[in-house]
Swiss-Prot record:
Residues that bear Phosphothreonine: 27
Gene name of the encoded protein: Aicda
Species assigned in the record: Mus musculus
Primary site of residence: nucleus
CDD domains: cytidine_deaminase
The protein, known as: Single-stranded DNA cytosine deaminase
GO cellular component: cytoplasm; nucleoplasm; nucleus; protein-containing complex
Names of required cofactors: Zn(2+)
Region annotated Required for interaction with RNF126, chain positions: 88-116
Record has Ubl conjugation as a keyword: yes
The keyword Zinc is annotated on this UniProt entry: yes
Transmembrane segments: none
Length: 198
C-alpha cells in the first residue's frame, strides 16, 4: 500500500489523458469503497495503489479487498479512477471476482484506454467487464477535480486543466462507446455507412 496521498507531479504525469503516453508504464488506481445502507452510504476506505513488478494494480486491489471479509448481507460500491484501463487478463479476473461477490458493485473511470499488441483482446476485456455490470467511463474534468481534492497532496492548490483535457476525454469517450456497443449495432452502423457510400 502506498502513502494515502499522491504527489502532484506523479498524479499529473500518470493521469494526463494525452494521446501518446510515452514512458507511462505504471498503472495507478485511486479507489473509494463505500457501504450502502438503505438510502445512505458510508465511506469505508480510500487511497491509491500502483502496479508492482509482476502484479497489475487491479489484482493488487482484489487481494487487498479480499482480506476485508466483506459481509455478504451488505452492499458495497467500489469506485476506481485509473491511469490506464484494465488489460484483458485483469478484466477477466475482476469480472470473476464480481461474480463471486454479487453484493459488490464497481465503477471504473479511466484516464486512457490500454491496448497491447493484440488490439482485439483489451476491447473484449472491457466488454466482459461491462457485461459483468461494471460501469466504465472516461475521466472528465469533474473526475480529475475530484481526484485532485481526494487523492493528491495538493497543498490547497486548485486543479487546473491542461490543454486538450476536454478534447481527449471526448475522443476517448467515443472510442469507449464504440468498444462497448453491442456488435449488432456496429454492424448496423457499417451497413448504414456503406449505403451512404462511405
Amino acid at each position: 500500500m502506498d502513502s494515502l496521498l499522491m504527489k502532484q507531479k506523479k498524479f499529473l504525469y500518470h493521469f494526463k489523458n494525452v494521446r501518446w503516453a510515452k514512458g507511462r508504464h505504471e498503472t495507478y488506481l485511486c479507489y473509494v469503497v463505500k457501504r450502502r445502507d438503505s438510502a445512505t452510504s458510508c465511506s469505508l476506505d480510500f487511497g491509491h495503489l500502483r502496479n508492482k513488478s509482476g502484479c497489475h494494480v487491479e489484482l493488487l486491489f482484489l487481494r487487498y479487498i479480499s482480506d476485508w471479509d466483506l459481509d455478504p448481507g451488505r452492499c458495497y460500491r467500489v469506485t476506481w479512477f485509473t491511469s490506464w484501463s484494465p488489460c484483458y487478463d485483469c478484466a477477466r479476473h475482476v469480472a470473476e471476482f464480481l461474480r463471486w461477490n454479487p453484493n459488490l458493485s464497481l465503477r471504473i473511470f479511466t484516464a486512457r484506454l490500454y491496448f497491447c499488441e493484440d488490439r482485439k483482446a483489451e476491447p473484449e476485456g472491457l466488454r466482459r467487464l461491462h457485461r459483468a455490470g461494471v460501469q466504465i467511463g472516461i475521466m472528465t474534468f469533474k473526475d480529475y477535480f475530484y481526484c485532485w481534492n481526494t487523492f493528491v497532496e495538493n497543498r490547497e492548490r486548485t486543479f487546473k486543466a491542461w490543454e486538450g483535457l476536454h478534447e481527449n476525454s471526448v475522443r476517448l469517450t467515443r472510442q469507449l462507446r464504440r468498444i462497448l456497443l453491442p456488435l449488432y449495432e456496429v454492424d448496423d452502423l457499417r451497413d448504414a455507412f456503406r449505403m451512404l457510400g462511405f
